[in-house]
Every structure is written in C-alpha cells, then in structure tokens.
From Swiss-Prot:
Inhibited by both FK506 and rapamycin. The keyword Isomerase applies. It comes from the Eukaryota. It comes from Gibberella zeae (strain ATCC MYA-4620 / CBS 123657 / FGSC 9075 / NRRL 31084 / PH-1) (Wheat head blight fungus). GO terms for biological process: chaperone-mediated protein folding. This is FK506-binding protein 2. Residues 39-127 form the PPIase FKBP-type domain. Belongs to the FKBP-type PPIase family. FKBP2 subfamily.
Length: 195
C-alpha cells in the first residue's frame, strides 16, 4: 500500500513538472558585454497580469520607479530569479510563470491562489555596471527584420526551456524505475535469503 502511494505521488509530481514550466519570451533582444548574473543588484520595470483574465495586479511603470533587488538571491519569486538571468540593460522579456515558480497555492493580495502570472519586464540597470549611452538591439544572423529577430530569439528560449523539461522528465522516469525496483525487491518475508 505504501509503495502504491509513493508511486502515485511520484507520478503526480512528474505530470506537474512536465506540464508547468517557466516560459521566457525575449521581446527586445539587446547586445551587451555584461549580462545579469546571480547575486547582481538589478533595477527592473515590470507589469504583472493574471494569465487567465489578463487583469493587471501590479506595475512599476505606474509608479514611475523600477523595483530594485538581488536577482537569484530569493528576494523575489522563483520565476523572476530564474527568468531574469542573462539579461542586458535595456532588454525586455515576457515571463509566463506557473504557480510553482510564483506564489504557489497562496493567495497574495489581488492574486488568487494557484495563479499563472505574466510579467512584462525591462532591465533598467545593474549595480556597478555603467548604463550604455545607446542600447544596441540584437539582430539575429540571417534575420531580415526586428520582428524576425525577436521570433528567432523567442524560439531559442523555447528550445532551452524544452531541453530543461526533457531533462527533468528523464530524471523522473529514472526515479520511477528505481522506486519500482525497490518495491519489487520488497516482500513480506522477515528475512532475505536470496544470496
């Protein structure tokens, strides 16, 4: 019975991990020498909406002041800590954040429990990194227009997300096989005399 519960929980986890992942869409790719790294103090403008209704729940743009925090240090939701790494000053991204990378099953202010969040983000600055005089947007090699460049950058981000999801799924399958082996080796006999 315990084994069945364990496998059921493992399978539920596997389905949840594969079904819900952080989605990163680069809407304005930028060229720079220094991208955001874990532990950087950053200044970020954003607009947050609920995926289901499109209702805005917060926006730094409305206040006229970007949010300042250390990226990758647990000061913000996990979706931001992971989704805002490797950004250039001036770059814009849209993050689609499932509950597991947001607020989970907790209701926070106008955000209902279990909500998928969508954030339009713009990196305004990185502590200790001079702001460039001119923001140079990135044109993907072979791209004929900015729209095509954005599309190609978004596809590259999606491919990276799929690779991560594939690795997680492989790890879950391996764990399920190991659990099945352990359960198969378990019986009600008080002693094991197989050897």
């Amino acid at each position: 019975m315990k084994a069945a519960l364990f496998l059921s929980a493992l399978a539920s986890t596997a389905v949840g991990v594969v079904a819900e992942e952080l989605k990163i869409d680069v809407t304005l790719p930028v060229i720079c020498e220094r991208k955001t790294q874990k532990g950087d103090g950053v200044h970020m403008h954003y607009r947050g909406t609920l995926k289901d209704s499109g209702k805005q729940f917060d926006a730094s743009y409305d206040r006229g002041t970007p949010l300042s925090f250390k990226v990758g240090a647990g000061q913000v939701i996990k979706g931001w800590d992971e989704g805002l790494l490797d950004m250039c000053i001036g770059e814009k991204r849209v993050l689609t954040i499932p509950p597991e990378f947001g607020y989970g099953q907790r209701a926070i202010g106008p955000i209902p429990a279990g909500s998928t969040l969508v954030f339009e983000t713009e990196l305004v600055g990185i502590d200790g990194v001079p702001k460039p005089e001119k923001i140079e947007t990135k044109v993907v090699e072979g791209a004929e227009s900015a729209a095509e460049a954005i599309s190609e950058a978004t596809e590259a981000a999606a491919t990276a997300s799929q690779k991560v999801a594939g690795k997680v799924a492989e790890a879950i399958v391996d764990a399920a096989k190991a659990a099945k082996t352990i359960i198969a080796d378990t019986d009600d006999a008080p002693e094991h005399e197989e050897l």
